[in-house]
Amino acid sequence: MTRRILPLSLVFIPLSCISASETDTLKLPNLTFGGREIEFIVTPPSSIAAQYITYANVSNYRGNFTISSCTQDQWFSRGLSTTNSSGAFVESMTSFTAIDNADLFFCNNYCTHQGGGGAINATGLISFKNNQNILFYNNTTIGTQFTGVALRTERNRGGALYGSSIELINNHSLNFINNTSGDMGGAVSTIQNLVIKNTSGIVAFENNHTTDHIPNTFATILARGGAVGCQGACEISHNTGPVVFNSNYGGYGGAISTGGQCIFRDNKDKLIFINNSALGWHNTSAQGNGAVISAGGEFGLLNNKGPIYFENNNASYIAGAISCNNLNFQENGPIYFLNNSALYGGAFHLFASPAANYIHTGSGDIIFNNNTELSTTGMSAGLRKLFYIPGTTNNNPITLSLGAKKDTRIYFYDLFQWGGLKKANTPPENSPHTVTINPSDEFSGAVVFSYKNISSDLQAHMIASKTHNQIKDSPTTLKFGTMSIENGAEFEFFNGPLTQESTSLLALGQDSILTVGKDASLTITHLGIILPGLLNDQGTTAPRIRVNPQDMTQNTNSNQAPVSTENVATQKIFFSGLVSLVDENYESVYDSCDLSRGKANQPILHIETTNDAQLSNDWKNTLNTSLYSLPHYGYQGLWTSNWMTTTRTVSLTNSTETQTANNSIQEQKNTSETFDSNSTTTAKIPSIRASTGGTTPLATTDVTVTRHSLVVSWTPIGYIADPARRGDLIANNLVSSGRNTTLYLRSLLPDDSWFALQGSAATLFTKQQKRLDYHGYSSASKGYAISSQASGAHGHKFLFSFSQSSDTMKEKRTNNKISSRYYLSALCFEQPMFDRIALIGAAAYNYGTHKTYNFYGTKKFSKGNFHSTTLGGSLRCELRDSMPFQSIMLTPFIQALISRTEPASIQEQGDLARLFSLKQPHTAVVSPIGIKGVYSSNKWPTVSCEMEVAYQPTLYWKRPILNTVLIKNNGSWETTNTPLAKHSFYGRGSSSLKFSYLKLFANYQAQVATSTVSHYMNAGGALVF
């Protein structure tokens, strides 16, 4: 038994090792953590190093090993085991436990014994709990060589850890870097289960791998799990930091291989699976399944809050990301499958065993983009396909549920092909192998099938190979939310019906095709046409709903003449309910699309059949094409619609060879879609024939296609702005700027000092009620003011003041707000007249900078910056000393307050951004009429109290008016403020305490009207002379 325990002094950053290189094999390695080179410095052994380490109950070199409560970093390095497992200890153990320790490092340990465990091997549980940073770097178990096909037992498992079960719980960080095993588990291998839980920092598996060391024996099956290999289940859950699997490779499961389920649950930060590979060959045949995950049971992503990335992973055979029995994605943040590849199944391989599959959004979208099949078989090469599902006959259900929650999407930018699942002696419409889209009312989002990110060359390749989105052999139901086919995508239902329930929307966009094939049907109850793409004048065509003119169930070989569907007289397309016009977000088109100009004879839908008996009875009446809309915001106008019918002849072929160079994607569209919509005669359309590599002509079949085109015209008559985006808050902000200026001027009154320097802090609260259909708001501001006063020999007084304040204004019933900063300068003078009359005048300039934030729903927002200027004036007349009442002087007064506010032009950015320009500035003149009472004591310190009340009518009022344009749709309207009451009452009270040359004061003002309540408070001090 050998024990190597050295304390370690190093600077350690618990981040993922982007690169980890060994600079000198004879010395401890330098690691590069996060771009910084970290050097290991080993100090001489000491007795402290072995604290709380026990090796108990040793029997035949097997026992329970425990490391606990070490306060110093522990280093286990350069162990070599050739006669037993466990490279760091040269012995395997019954169990291994590390608990409550400082950093633990297992580096450069090597085990050539077939028992495995490059660092640690235990026949029972391996447990790491409540430790700080844990690093397994460059540990290896490899060396046992076998030849021949009979030896199928795995050897050299677990490049770092090999145990019956492994638990890594409540540690600060876990890093498995550059570990290697011969067979299962390049870093970690278990006979039963693996649990990684409650890690506060990063969990990183990088550059781990297995080696296929049994030649020509399908050894990739054994060398599985490039980072983790479990014969049981794997659970990675409740971790706070990011979880990273980067650049691992193995035979089956480039990152993780499990015999049971593999679950990622309740993690708080990112999950990243990048650059992992499943690699292997048998003779000249490709092997290697599941570039990231190969699970014998379910693969689940459940309630993970951060974004999840599967990117740039590849498998040499099947599944560019995940190979498993079934998928379960629910309640996660956004999920991205990007740029993954495999020979078959760019993203997924499903075993086609009875199970329920769920691809549901949580708080973010799910996006599939550029997941590619690298098949070498003809036209399939290079196509972006997601699934590989082996065809099977199974009497127990294999189901798929696609669900997008409110304000989320599932985007399929790659080909979605689901099918080949059958039940014996059962017609397709009764098959238990169903697909459900948005299964319950909580799923009100959209499932989108789009060719938006597919190049025109690849689309031409797809057309030539007759490859598109499809669901085959599985009855499909669209229950809630939206299913959208757009941006040139084609979707075919084959050997199974699509049934839409009236609580959902089936949306079709530009150049899209919805096809019903042999032994299938479409039941459409609410059809949406995505209008903006049809109005862009860029050569786009209206969407099509069609019966496939070719019977794909017979005569599909290239040397056979295709069979058409013109003799199929069975009803295949059933229409009922409305046709609606929607925008790219599947919402009302009137407030998002530019309908400012009229449109005539615009095709918005084509319905194509080879036999009109394929349409439901009286379909033109059961499909409501009146385009009538309930009262709505946005453009107002009138739609008219009518049907036009034309015919054409197309030639069918069975060619799946690469098309000739002159058959571009646009040429194919022209031949299949473009014809004179005013003609009712048959037009002969040249067939698109691919090169066969020889001179033998292809067998063709001509078929007549009848097209019914829905053509509409639009006449605009006006625009009504949606109150949510009308801009009331900006106009209210201008009114508030004027009110704040006059409130300040009203309190700007000189005192009896000869000279004074004054400073104060102030706050203002305003609450505006909702009136008519205009939003109310509340605002709060705080700031400071400084002033200087001087008095002349004849009672003249001059006062200069400056104030700065910040204000936040929030609109009621929305999340819109404006943050403002104001800079106000004012000059005040007092002129005594006839001993008893005083005239007090003031002028102010108030400059404001503003940031506006507007929120629409949960994902859309706009913001903008602007500034405003306010000019204010005040003239006050007081009749003094005329009404003494004991020690209180009552003084009547009348005052005129004027303000004028103008903003600069405002242009927002973001969703639903608007442009505001000034039509009419805000001007207000109010005249408080009231009485002031003043009390002053003769004792030291002098106490003074002052109170005034007034009735304040509005003498002149001009509402601010802004010309507003919604940039997205060119809709325009006028924006103004929430109506205000014309009469209000005003009160002010102040108190001061004077100590010789120091005066302390506080005052409060309130203005009350039926529409608005304002409270102004300030307090401060002054030096008076």
Curated annotation (Swiss-Prot):
Keywords, in A-Z order: Cell outer membrane, Cell wall, Membrane, Secreted, Signal, Transmembrane, Transmembrane beta strand
Domain of life (superkingdom): Bacteria
Signal peptide start-end: 1-20
Pfam families noted in UniProt: Autotransporter, ChlamPMP_M
Region ranges (Disordered): 654-681
Composition bias, Polar residues: 659-681
Cross-referenced NCBIfam families: POMP_repeat
Name recorded for this polypeptide: Probable outer membrane protein PmpF
Organism annotation: Chlamydia muridarum (strain MoPn / Nigg)
Gene encoding the protein: pmpF
